[in-house]
Amino acid sequence: MKMDVIAREQIIYGSLQGSNKNKDWTSRLPPPSAYTLDLMSKKAKTTTGGSSNGSNATATSTTTSTSSSIKHKQPAGSSNNNVGQSQSKKTKPSGSYNSNSNYYYYAADEEEGGSADYALSNYDKKAVEELSLRLLDELRAAKSRHLTCTEVSLPCDLTPSVAREIIRVSEKEPRGIRGCTIYIEFEDEPKNSRRIASIKVDSDTVSTFEVYLTLRQDHRGWTSLLPQFMKSLARTITISPEYTITKNKLYSADGLGARRSYSFGSHAHRPSAAIATPTN
């Protein structure tokens, strides 16, 4: 019995029915059908759209997080680029910058202006404090040298108030407070005053004006109730909160000094507001 094996070979290799030739697998494959192409294009669009949406969402979230982090970091001055640009802004105010940078530059300029005002205010406070301490030192030195007493009591805000007024009257002077010479006079009785100290604020600066500070003795304290012989034993002088500042310019257009008198101090009695200078 003879068996036909050609049909089996045709089934295995996919040859055409009724042909004894096998399919040539080295030949080029036929193009896919239009239906297959349509399905593949739709699938590709769906996949690409989903991936692009995901990437856009990722990029958007990344951009949002990045921009939000920049907004939080830039005002604090933690960005290296902004630090360098703000420094160049200080040296080159006329430079051109983008809108986002301008926001921070203007904020920095406002802060600098605020900090400048704040620094000036601190300078005034420091000058007042230094001059107030110098006045206290001169009063301590004059206590035993000119006042012949063991204790000098004065209102707690007297020397800061005097220092503020002296600095205020020196604002329009060509050399400011550095060109001031202060003469301190003490008046124990009406129209009976004597000079007890003098201060040249800056010894290296030529004086352009003088300030005469007149302090008065307060006779309303507890020592006024003592008998005369007890007053000499107490040897305590109480300074009144009232004082007089007289400003004398050492220059003018016509060659004569312009003498101006200013009276400062509270006329109200300030009870128990006193500082006792200890005995050296």
From Swiss-Prot:
One biological process term in Gene Ontology: negative regulation of signal transduction
Membrane-spanning intervals of the chain: none
Residue ranges, annotated region (Disordered): 39-96
Predominant localisation class: cytoplasm
Presence of keyword Cytoplasm: yes
Location of the protein in the cell: Cytoplasm
Role summary: Inhibits cell growth by regulating the Tor pathway upstream of the Tsc1-Tsc2 complex and downstream of Akt1. Acts as a cell death activator during head development.
UniProt cross-references to PANTHER family, sorted A to Z: DNA-DAMAGE-INDUCIBLE TRANSCRIPT 4 PROTEIN DDIT4, PROTEIN CHARYBDE-RELATED
Protein name from the UniProt record: Protein scylla
Native source species: Drosophila melanogaster
